[in-house]
Amino acid sequence: MVMAMDQNLFNEVMYLLDELSQDTTVPKNVRKVAQDSKTKLSQENESLDLRCATVLSMLDEMANDPNVPSHGRTDLYTIISKLEALAKS
């Protein structure tokens, strides 16, 4: 049961990253980090905790970028929150 919930959360994070990577209203560097984050999370040769921590660091750096519009920052914080929940499970 827990694994199914983890998979659902993982799929939701991947979907949100995909949406962000295609959002033309956010800067190109944010879209690239979202795409790189999807790639990193998909690499199953590392533990999920390590992948989540790496992606959290990447997204946190983008969330602190002053050039990111407020709606983009909100999207980043939503993804960060879900990733933290995924890493803890």
Curated annotation (Swiss-Prot):
What protein family is recorded?
A: Belongs to the UPF0147 family.
Judging by the UniProt lineage, the source's domain of life is Archaea
Instruction: State what protein this is by name.
Output: UPF0147 protein TV0625
**Signal sequence: where?**
none
Q: Name one Pfam family in it.
A: UPF0147
Sorted alphabetically, which InterPro entries does this protein's record hold? Ta0600-like_sf, UPF0147
Recorded hits in Gene3D superfamilies, A to Z, give: Ta0600-like
